[in-house]
Design a protein with these regions (language model features):
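Conserved beta-strand hairpin/beta-sheet module of binuclear metal-dependent hydrolase folds
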Residues: 2-56, 147-150, 154-158
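Short, structured coil segments at secondary-structure junctions
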Residues: 9, 87-88, 111
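Active-site neighborhood of phospho(di)ester-bond hydrolases with catalytic His/Asp-centered motifs
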Residues: 41-43, 64-73, 92-96, 156-160, ...
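Short, glycine/acidic-enriched loop or turn micro-motifs at the edges of active sites
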Residues: 45-46, 75, 163, 223
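Active-site metal-binding motif and surrounding structural segment of the metallo-beta-lactamase
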Residues: 48-93
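Metallo-beta-lactamase
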Residues: 94-218, 222-227, 237-240
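C-terminal regulatory/interaction regions
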Residues: 226-255
Length: 255
């Protein structure tokens, strides 16, 4: 069931949290539409493709899909690239580091002229009458990692930053108990393992505090809506020890 995060009549942001069925990790897919044009955000792989295709038709036709944005290269992000390139005229928008990896998901030649490489500093992207910001989140958790900030809705689509593990229905609800969420939804453990290090966390938080964000919506699990819980999340993430901060000789022993 689609969840409308924002709708002013012309500009809409929509989340899908229950499309993954089976053994795959729960994942959220998103779309933004403005002026009749559409963009898919982290549309996933074969587990979500046909379901997302059916749902998106309620908001825009495949022929009006201008972009498929991929925050990074993981299969739960963009393994369905081949399908979208075949049935739409959309271009895939992804970090320049991953442009030559996407063809491995596709039949030969289908990506030619269909890729937009995001430079390391990020960029603006026009969609209909709106302008979206693609902002860097490098090493959170991959090199060449980007997020989408929508100034109109004030939503930050944060990819794996803020991600947690839960069922699809629960993922459609904003987090209310932050401290409980840290443990019960495995957010703390996920970030300690998947995020690169505290330096990357601190630099990212410093950048995000410069934006007017009303809602942080990750690609897995629940979201953070409202200034109070967003600040609580930023305070936690800013001091998090993770990734290489936690490595020791014990992690590099011959089995």
């Amino acid at each position: 069931m689609p969840i409308e995060l924002f709708n002013n009549g012309d500009h809409k942001c929509v989340a899908f949290t229950e499309l993954v069925q089976g053994e795959g990790i729960q994942a959220n897919q998103f779309l933004i539409t403005d002026g009749g044009e559409g963009m898919l955000l982290d549309p996933g792989g074969n587990l979500t493709y046909k379901h997302l295709l059916a749902e998106m038709a309620n908001y825009f036709l495949p022929s009006r899909t201008r972009y498929v944005f991929a925050s990074h290269q993981d299969p739960d992000i963009v393994a369905s690239a081949n399908g979208w390139l075949l049935i739409t005229d959309a271009k895939i928008v992804i970090a320049q580091e991953w442009v030559r990896f996407i063809p491995h998901f596709c039949i030969k030649g289908v990506t030619e002229g269909r890729m937009i490489a995001i430079p390391p500093k990020g960029m603006d992207l026009e969609l209909g009458n709106s302008r979206l910001k693609l902002i860097p989140a490098h090493f959170l958790h991959t090199v060449g990692n980007f997020q989408v900030y929508d100034p109109l809705s004030k939503i930050l689509f944060s990819g794996d930053v803020g991600a947690s593990v839960m069922d699809g229905h629960s993922a459609g609800l904003p987090v209310e108990d932050f401290d409980g969420h840290l443990v019960e939804s495995h957010m703390d453990g996920f970030h300690r393992r998947y995020m690169c290090n505290n330096k990357a966390c601190r630099l990212w938080v410093n950048m995000i505090r410069q934006l007017d964000v009303e809602w942080i919506v990750p690609q897995h699990g629940g979201s953070f809506k409202g200034k109070a819980i967003i600040n609580r999340f930023l305070d936690w993430f800013e001091t998090l020890e993770c990734g290489t901060d936690l490595l020791s000789e014990a992690d590099f022993r011959i089995p």
